[in-house]
Regions:
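Conserved beta/loop motifs at nucleotide-recognition and modification sites
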Residues: 1-256
Length: 256
């Protein structure tokens, strides 16, 4: 248990350092991005691109490489491509598992990571592929530890999400109180990509400045966990009609 807490604290410290470095324009050469919160990951990738590459120069200096079929040769050629009318290049590799690469490719990749040019920023994004370091592969793990940062974009704490939901609604000209923001999280889950689309729908639907629970219930699509809780609660209160209605909603959600 203590080890898990220490790992979580270390990951949070790296995340805070990454945000501070980014705000100060101090962007390194190598990053591993992983974690469930894709909204934040994509947000910070956009921030990195904006800070590293002048507007209009993205097509020359921003390189997006799919992990499937990627070779060390292809990556090396992209890394060696000099920036054009930009101080740096940004390379984003999606879903390439460094630690599961064939030995020859892994050795070549390790060499690339160990000697990245100063103008290059290389980001490995683990989206559908889970990130798991393997200390037995000492050279690769050592290169990542020495040259890069492993940044985890974890699910946000409820207090941070409530504040963020409030800011998003204010940007749409609405207000929402803490209890209703918490209800929205309960109903729609705590991942920001899911919440942002529901916030947009609710903001467009709400007639008054203050968003109400009725506004949320009218248009928000609940996650299955919330409906299961609602059904068991209705069963506990012996409200069978409501329980069966909720069961019907669950079947519909599963079909969708």
């Amino acid at each position: 248990m203590a080890t898990k807490r220490n790992d979580k604290s270390a990951a949070q410290a790296v995340y805070r350092k990454f945000k501070k470095d980014l705000s100060q324009g101090t962007i390194g050469s190598l990053y591993i991005f992983h974690g469930e919160e894709a909204y934040l990951r994509d947000y910070y990738l956009d921030q990195m691109k904006a800070k590293l590459i002048p507007g209009g120069m993205e097509s020359f200096n921003y390189h997006l490489l799919p992990g499937k079929g990627l070779t060390a040769q292809r990556l090396g050629e992209t890394v060696d491509a000099l920036p054009m009318m930009s101080p740096r290049t940004l390379i984003v590799v999606n879903d390439y598992d460094l630690f599961k690469a064939p030995e020859g490719e892994r050795t070549a990749m390790t060499k690339i990571l160990s000697d990245l040019p100063e103008y290059c920023c290389l980001v490995f994004v683990y989206d559908t592929v889970p990130y798991k370091s393997d200390a037995r592969m000492r050279k690769l793990a050592g290169a990542i530890q020495e040259k890069g940062q492993v940044v985890q974009f974890a699910r946000q704490q409820q207090g941070d999400l409530v504040d963020w939901i409030g800011r998003r609604f204010r940007a749409l000209g609405h207000e929402i109180d803490t209890a209703d923001a918490q209800y929205l999280i309960f109903l729609c889950g705590d991942l920001m990509n899911g919440l942002i689309s529901e916030i947009g729908k609710i903001g467009a639907f709400a007639k008054n400045r203050r968003v109400t629970r009725q506004d949320i219930d009218a248009v928000a699509i609940p996650v299955i966990d919330a409906k299961v809780f609602e059904m068991t609660d209705a069963l506990g209160r012996r409200q069978m009609d409501q329980a069966f209605a909720t069961l019907g909603d669950l079947f519909q959600l599963r079909q969708e």
